[in-house]
């Protein structure tokens, strides 16, 4: 472990270099008189001073100061409404690197010297393996790039926002009253959140569900509840704004996939903390420092990204299943969202189709995670709500009402049976119903 910590000394030294870069950037790129110039110089000086201090293992606390500086640099262009593209690029990129070099690199190896055993008791796979996390990290970076493009338009760095499907839809949404209600660029806020998700995805070893529960918890909070709220807000844009956004929908799809892939690791972490508490260990200490878990199994051979594609895909999607019932639920959700323009449903009835269809898609997608199949029961209620809404609310003719009634009834029925479960989950299996 000591050797690994010594090898991670290049993290603080890289932070020093990034700090020097920020110190000299305002004058180099022509924004020396702006608020962003002050921010960059303060962050740069902080990174240089505390990066040098963090090189010594005795002053590991200094790395957290560098982390705080990087965190500010990531959000500073949004809070200060950076008018210069170079200032936005510089501060965002530097913030990402500072966070990575100060905390992520040093946390690539957990407090425990060994990552084994890595498979939770009764489980058939390791939810914290890097191959399991790789698609989440990739989707987070993809979403970051899309959100950054939209943030550039909101901050005035570009004259247009790219939208190959809905024309000016993206621009209309980014300049809508809903977006203007945010004190900062909402697209930029999303970009910063995606960057943090990707960075936290790298942290911890192959057994971080028990060796670094706080990392998994932070990762889960950023991806699951925050992600679900973001998804719902995005898919409801036609109701709130009256337009669609291609990049927003692509981000929502990526976030849904991230939620599904993250849930098994979060469940494993919760089971670990529950066992530690039953054994009399302090929950607070277990949360921050981790520990061993009884009956955990060693991973015979962890999958690698260099393995054959079929093996990698199998490892990436362990814990995810698409039974025909959930596939049908997804299709019915799409049908409900497309029904208003097809049947010319107007007023509140049209909004009900959009809302219930979007929620049905979100619920069915989350239920693709075998550990969360129980949430499919929400679609039973949504199906019944659709039947009631289409007959009680104005704006739909007889054909539209019959279509919604059939779709709602089918949604409720296909959500009743549980789909096939391929993996095993130990004590959590009693909740998979």
Task: Locate predicted features.
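A charge-rich, low-complexity, intrinsically flexible signal that marks solvent-exposed coils, linkers
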Residues: 52, 382, 389, 395-396
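Central hydrophobic cores of alpha-helical transmembrane segments
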Residues: 66-73, 379-386
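Active-site-proximal polar cores
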Residues: 426
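Transmembrane-helix signature of multi-pass solute transporters
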Residues: 75, 232-235, 388
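N-terminal signal-anchor module of multipass membrane proteins
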Residues: 2-5, 18-20, 24
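Membrane-interfacial helix-loop segments of redox and metal-homeostasis proteins
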Residues: 7, 24-39, 46-49, 58-60, ...
């Amino acid at each position: 472990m000591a050797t690994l910590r010594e090898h991670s000394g290049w993290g603080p030294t890289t932070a020093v270099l990034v700090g020097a870069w920020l110190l000299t950037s305002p004058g180099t790129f022509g924004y020396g008189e702006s608020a962003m110039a002050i921010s960059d110089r303060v962050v740069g000086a902080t990174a240089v001073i505390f990066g040098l201090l963090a090189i010594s293992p005795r002053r590991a606390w200094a790395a957290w100061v560098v982390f705080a500086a990087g965190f500010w640099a990531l959000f500073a262009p949004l809070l200060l409404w950076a008018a210069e593209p170079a200032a936005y690029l510089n501060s965002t990129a530097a913030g990402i690197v500072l966070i990575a070099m100060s905390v992520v690199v040093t946390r690539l190896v957990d407090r425990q010297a060994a990552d084994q055993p890595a498979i939770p008791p009764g489980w058939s796979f390791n939810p914290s393996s890097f191959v399991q996390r790789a698609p989440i990290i990739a989707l987070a970076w993809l979403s970051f790039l899309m959100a950054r493009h939209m943030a550039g338009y909101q901050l005035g760095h570009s004259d247009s926002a790219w939208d190959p499907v809905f024309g000016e839809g993206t621009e209309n949404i980014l300049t809508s009253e809903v977006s203007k209600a945010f004190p900062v660029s909402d697209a930029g806020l999303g970009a910063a959140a995606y960057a943090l998700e990707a960075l936290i995805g790298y942290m911890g070893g192959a057994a971080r569900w028990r060796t670094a529960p706080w990392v998994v918890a932070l990762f889960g909070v950023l991806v699951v509840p925050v992600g679900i709220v973001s998804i719902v807000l995005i898919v409801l844009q036609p109701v709130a704004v009256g337009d669609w956004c291609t990049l927003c929908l692509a981000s929502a799809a990526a976030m849904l996939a991230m939620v599904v892939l993250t849930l098994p690791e979060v469940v494993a972490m919760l089971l670990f903390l529950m066992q530690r508490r039953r054994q009399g260990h302090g929950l607070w200490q277990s949360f921050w420092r981790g520990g061993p878990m009884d009956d955990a199994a060693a991973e015979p051979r962890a999958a690698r990204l260099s393995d054959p594609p079929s093996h990698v895909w199998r490892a990436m999607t362990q814990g995810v299943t698409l039974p025909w019932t959930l596939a049908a639920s997804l299709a019915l959700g799409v049908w409900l969202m497309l029904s208003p323009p097809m049947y010319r449903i107007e007023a509140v009835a049209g909004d009900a189709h959009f809302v219930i269809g979007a929620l049905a898609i979100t619920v069915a997608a989350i239920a693709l995670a075998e550990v969360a199949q129980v949430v499919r029961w929400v679609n039973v209620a949504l199906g019944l709500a659709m039947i009631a809404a289409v007959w009680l609310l104005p704006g739909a003719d007889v054909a539209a009402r019959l279509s919604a009634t059939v779709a709602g009834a089918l949604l409720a029925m296909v959500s009743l049976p549980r789909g096939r479960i391929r993996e095993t989950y130990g004590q959590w299996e009693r909740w998979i119903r």
